Amino acid sequence: MKLLTGKVAIVTGAARGIGAAIALKLAAQGSHIAFTYVSDSSEEKANSLVAEIEKLGVKAKAYKANAADFAACENFVNDVVAHFGTVDICVNNAGISKDNLLLRMTP
C-alpha cells in the first residue's frame, strides 16, 4: 500500500517546475491531485500534467486560479471539495513576484 492512498492534495502553481514535481511525487504515493495554474500559456502544460498523473492510477484536475487573489483561492478550494470530497494535504507552492527583486517589493 502506498503512503497517501486515497488522500487528496492541493498543490498551487503546479503546471511546471517544482510544483509539477511535487504533484507527481504525491500522486506516486497514491494521492489524488488538484492543482492550480495561473496563465493561459500554462494550460497545455497543466493538461499534460493531469494526463501524466492519471497514468499513476489516481485522479487529477487542473484549475486556473490566481494564488494572489483571495476570492479565487476560496472558489478553488470550494471546487476541489465539491469534486474530490475533501482536502487532506495543501502545498502552497505558487510564486508571486512583482519584479523579481525582493528588496524592491512593497507589502
List each model region and its residues.
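Conserved glycine-rich cofactor-binding loop
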Residues: 8, 13-17
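Active-site beta-alpha loop architecture of Rossmann-like, nucleotide-cofactor-dependent enzymes
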Residues: 17, 39, 97-100
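Substrate-binding pocket helix/loop in short-chain dehydrogenase/reductase
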Residues: 101-102, 106
